[in-house]
């Protein structure tokens, strides 16, 4: 029973993280614009699009958590995290070039992408069976 409950607690926390992050793309768009690699076009549109995608994927994780929708949403989050990794690298490079005091945070953020990917990936599989009541 505990494993089943933890599965859903983690699922809802994961969804909340991505919904909040997506909303933050609109509330603090300037922060995300600074992380955009210069080789990408339409920075404003890409920041807004990634915010919408994070919100949609977060909602999809919990909208019907016992269906394939959750699986597809989790795979979407995994792919999104891989896709935005260059922006995390760009943030580090920008901060390194300007001796930004947040450089250490930007450096630590890079390997933190792996546990976030693993967390989302955990929801790409079938959920554990609910234990039968005694």
Question: What residues fall within each predicted segment?
Answer:
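Membrane-interface extramembranous regions
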Residues: 1-134
């Amino acid at each position: 029973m505990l494993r089943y409950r933890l599965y859903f607690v983690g699922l809802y926390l994961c969804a909340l993280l991505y919904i909040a992050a997506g909303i933050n793309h609109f509330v603090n768009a300037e922060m995300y614009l600074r992380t955009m690699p210069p080789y990408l076009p339409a920075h404003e549109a890409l920041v807004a699009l990634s915010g919408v995608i994070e919100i949609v994927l977060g909602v999809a994780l919990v909208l019907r958590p016992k269906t394939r929708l959750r699986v597809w949403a989790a795979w979407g989050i995994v792919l999104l995290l891989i896709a935005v990794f260059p922006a995390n690298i760009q943030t580090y490079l920008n901060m390194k070039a300007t001796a930004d005091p947040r450089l250490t945070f930007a450096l630590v953020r890079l390997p933190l992408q792996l546990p976030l990917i693993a967390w989302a990936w955990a929801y790409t599989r079938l959920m554990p069976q609910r234990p039968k009541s005694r």
